[in-house]
């Protein structure tokens, strides 16, 4: 009797396994068929040539600068659009400050080398500081006004205010990896209505995935799906994606030393287009361009000061109060007026000189005519 029960149980288990296998096969067939159909649709559309891609790269929008010229130079002009850039480092090194600087710099006008757009900040750790962002926005506006005062010939029709900069930043707070996956999945609906968004910052990508996953394969699949969606969004909507990553300790095989490596493992390493590692060296902050498809690996120092990310030793002009701004504008007006008056006086002098020259020429012509008449009279006599 027991043997019959065991046989029935084994048969049921085998039937269940067979059903599961059949379900898996059916799911695989559905996925395969969908992929084949989508691939056929891709082939039906006209492709794009390498020359067109090159022209698009040359004629594309400006990069998002960091206000550290050495870092911008490493990236050939700043944080690139249509790419995923990862910034990783130990706590307190300046990752969040770098994120805040990129957020406010997204508002820089086209005429001054910016992208003149808006930004999305996805906060997973509660790191956002309204006061710090407002401080950076104030110094950004002051910097742009100083640039215009020093270069009055600069042609621009738009200078943002502090309120405009802050109003251009959309903030989202998430607490769980399912929330961030859902948010990224729904972002295209938001971006269709807000096509001037040029930056998405995730600070940090690490925190939602540091919880203990019972299935590490699930974590890897979730990360890959999230990264794929971010890459599609960056390419489709012509914007930059910047993700912050923490570091963890890795023990060497011989168990004699340990090193700090970016979190999330090797699979995540191949996802990002650029990787910048921030680190300390002799009490100085450094930025190391660790991974890049087109630039060599290099590093440069940078500072975090009251007004944001800057070059080491950079002297920022003092902020202008409203009275100083009015005085500077009046000086510029007087200078332009004096230049115009001088130009008018020079033109008048030139006209007078031309008139004098014309009079002299007329006198010379009259004298020549008189001499000719006298000579003719002499010949006749």
Swiss-Prot record:
Any one biological process term the GO annotation gives: meiotic DNA recombinase assembly
Function according to Swiss-Prot or TrEMBL: Involved in the homologous recombination repair (HRR) pathway of double-stranded DNA breaks arising during DNA replication or induced by DNA-damaging agents.
Family the UniProt entry places it in: Belongs to the RecA family. RAD51 subfamily.
Coiled coil: 323-377
Cross-referenced CDD domains: Rad51C
InterPro entries documented for this protein: DNA_recomb/repair_Rad51_C (IPR013632), HR_Repair_Mediator (IPR052093), P-loop_NTPase (IPR027417), RecA_ATP-bd (IPR020588)
GO-annotated cellular components: nucleus; Rad51B-Rad51C-Rad51D-XRCC2 complex; Rad51C-XRCC3 complex; replication fork
Region (Disordered): 1-24, 313-381
Keyword Coiled coil among UniProt keywords: yes
The name this protein goes by in its record: DNA repair protein RAD51 homolog 3
Keyword Transmembrane helix appears in the UniProt entry: no
Record field: compositional bias (Low complexity): 8-24, 339-370
Compartment(s): Nucleus
């Amino acid at each position: 009797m027991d043997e019959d029960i065991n046989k029935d149980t084994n048969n049921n288990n085998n039937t269940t396994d067979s059903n599961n296998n059949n379900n898996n096969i059916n799911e695989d067939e559905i996925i395969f068929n969908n992929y084949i159909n989508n691939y056929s649709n891709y082939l039906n559309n006209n492709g794009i040539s390498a020359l067109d891609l090159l022209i698009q790269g040359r004629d594309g929008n400006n990069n998002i600068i960091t206000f550290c010229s050495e870092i911008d130079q490493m990236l050939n002009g700043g944080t690139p659009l249509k790419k995923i850039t990862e910034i990783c480092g130990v706590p307190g090194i300046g990752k969040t400050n770098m994120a805040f600087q990129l957020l406010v710099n997204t508002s820089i006008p086209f005429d001054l080398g910016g992208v003149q757009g808006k930004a999305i900040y996805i906060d997973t750790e509660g790191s956002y500081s309204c006061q710090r962002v407002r401080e950076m926005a104030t110094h950004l506006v002051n910097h742009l006004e100083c640039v215009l005062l020093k270069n009055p010939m600069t042609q621009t029709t738009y200078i943002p205010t502090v309120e405009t900069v802050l109003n251009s930043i959309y903030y989202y707070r998430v607490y769980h990896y399912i929330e961030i996956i859902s948010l990224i999945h729904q972002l295209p609906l938001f971006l269709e209505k807000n096509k001037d968004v040029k930056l998405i910052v995730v600070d940090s990508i690490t925190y939602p995935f540091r919880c203990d996953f019972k299935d590490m394969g699930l974590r890897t699949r979730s990360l890959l799906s999230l990264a794929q969606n971010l890459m599609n969004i960056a390419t489709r909507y012509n914007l930059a994606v910047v993700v912050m990553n923490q570091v963890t300790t890795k023990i060497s095989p011989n168990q004699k030393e340990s090193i700090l490596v970016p979190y999330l493992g090797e699979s995540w390493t191949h996802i990002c287009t650029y990787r910048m590692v921030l680190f300390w060296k002799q009490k100085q902050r450094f930025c190391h361009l660790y991974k890049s498809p087109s630039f060599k690996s290099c590093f440069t120092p940078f500072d975090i000061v009251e007004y944001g990310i800057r070059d080491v030793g950079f002297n920022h002009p003092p902020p202008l109060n409203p009275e100083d701004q009015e005085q500077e504008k009046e000086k510029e007006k007087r200078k332009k007026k004096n230049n115009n008056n001088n130009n008018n006086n020079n033109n008048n002098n030139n006209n007078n000189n031309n008139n004098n020259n014309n009079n002299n020429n007329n006198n010379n012509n009259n004298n020549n005519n008189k001499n000719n008449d006298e000579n003719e009279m002499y010949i006749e006599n």
